[in-house]
Design a protein with these regions (language model features):
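Subtilisin-like serine protease catalytic core
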Residues: 98-111, 116-131, 139-187, 205-209, ...
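Bacterial signal peptide processing site
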Residues: 22-24
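Autoinhibitory propeptides
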Residues: 26-89
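Extracellular S/T/G-rich loop segment that most often corresponds to the catalytic His/Ser-adjacent loop
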Residues: 115, 237-240, 245-337, 341
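Substrate-binding/access-modulating region of protease and related hydrolase catalytic domains
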Residues: 32-39, 100, 106, 174-262, ...
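C-terminal subdomain of the subtilisin-like protease fold in secreted/lumenal serine endopeptidases
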Residues: 205-213, 337-384
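C-terminal motif of bacterial Sec signal peptides marking the signal peptidase cleavage site
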Residues: 18-20
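N-terminal domain-start motif of subtilase-like serine proteases
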Residues: 83-111, 134-140, 276-278, 373-374
């Protein structure tokens, strides 16, 4: 999943000679210039910003990603409180912590994830990591930001939906080649789904995999898509639910991620907002969820485990469906705890029947954008 563009030394020299400048004499970027470049990118994870004056950047500030290693200056945008944002982002929201307090934690339910490389020792999940294997180029590089994020959103001890679920994790690639030569191919993910299905047959009672989470989507004609869909069908036939991004699958089509006011309470629907990546489509009339058919879970403004260290965290202003998928997998793990025989079809029906409408006002117009999942009501409908 890591796409590195590598140039051979001879090619580098040839390009330099053609440019008429010989070897590069470009001076290193000054620290302040480097910091300002990071500000423009919006990714401030690990950045040292102490020499900057960030006042006046209120509009941009709430789109920044940062982590517990970001070093902030004294001069911050007015009202911007990164520590508070990070702490609020740890709350999975929708009343889940109240359910955790009642013992509904996904205890003993297996969640399998296929994603990028994972640091195995993070405090959010390390003590419940039952199986971890890397394949292909995922085994050649360091842990990514994506892997620990999706794992912790699903089952993290403090940030996760199912904080006592068990983790089975495969790190693999979504294709072959590197850089411009990268070619997307889902065949390896198909093999991984089959690996997990086979692994599940060997697991002791009380530790079985009930759901596979893959933060990936595809089109029918993509290389390997047919093989992956066949593997998913085999997993489902073996009693394992599979959650990914697939609007052509009736079990997955309804799910969508939503946002939240920066300092809003993650447990109050009044503080929910349209998702950052699809908000404009709501106002333009292109959004497909205005009829209330979509089921919404938290996606933006989330804090997750970081690969920077076993106790480090990263805050993501905008999440994308990559963060919504493990959230749904975690919800299903809770359902499996309260009703071990539950199917994903039953879970989906209960989610639909108990979800609550949400809308947003803009320029005097109310825009409905779906229904927020109500975990307590969902689980009660299943017999919790």
């Amino acid at each position: 999943m890591k796409n590195r563009k590598l140039l051979r030394p001879a090619l580098c020299l040839l390009l330099a000679l053609l440019a008429g400048c010989g070897p590069s004499r470009e001076e290193p970027m000054e620290p302040e210039a480097e910091s300002r470049a990071l500000l423009s990118s919006g990714d401030l994870r690990g950045a040292d910003l102490r020499e900057l004056d960030l006042t006046g950047l209120e509009e941009a500030a709430y789109r920044w990603d940062f982590d517990t290693r970001t070093l902030w200056p004294e001069e911050l945008p007015e009202g911007f409180d990164p520590a508070r944002l990070l702490e609020l982002g740890k709350d999975p929201g929708l009343g889940l912590r109240a359910l955790h307090g009642r013992g509904i934690t996904g205890r003993g339910v297996g969640i399998a994830i296929i994603d990028q490389a994972l640091p195995a020792d993070h405090q959010e999940y390390g003590d419940r990591l039952r199986f971890y294997q890397e394949y292909h180029t995922a085994a050649q590089g360091p842990a990514s930001a994506h892997g620990p994020a999706v794992a912790s959103i699903a089952l993290g001890k403090t940030v996760g939906v199912a904080p006592e679920a068990l983790l089975y994790f495969l790190a693999d690639d979504l294709g072959t080649g590197e850089g411009a030569a990268f070619s997307r191919d889902l065949s390896w993910y198909a093999e991984d789904v089959d690996r997990l299905t086979a692994l599940n047959e060997t697991l002791p009672e009380g530790e079985s995999i009930r759901v596979i989470s893959m933060s990936v989507g595809w089109m029918p004609g993509d290389p390997g898509a047919e093989a992956l869909e066949a593997a998913i069908a085999r997993a489902r036939a073996a009693g394992i639910a599979v959650v990914c991004v697939n609007s052509r699958d009736p079990l997955l089509e309804p799910w969508m991620g939503m946002g939240r006011r920066p300092y809003g309470d993650p447990n109050r629907l009044e503080d929910c907002l349209p998702g950052a990546f699809w908000e404009e489509s709501l106002y333009s009339g292109e959004y497909r969820g205005t009829d209330g058919s979509l089921l919404l879970v938290p996606m933006d403004g989330r804090t997750a485990a970081s690969p920077a260290g076993g106790a480090e965290y990263a805050y993501f202003a905008g999440g994308g469906m990559s963060w919504a998928v493990p959230y749904v997998a975690g919800l299903y793990a809770l359902a499996c705890q309260v009703k071990p025989e539950v199917t994903f079809e039953e879970f989906l029906a209960a989610a639909r029947s108990t979800a609550r409408p949400v809308s947003v006002w803009r320029d005097g117009v109310e825009y409905p954008y779906g229904k927020a999942v109500d975990p307590a009501a969902l689980l009660e409908a299943l017999g919790a």
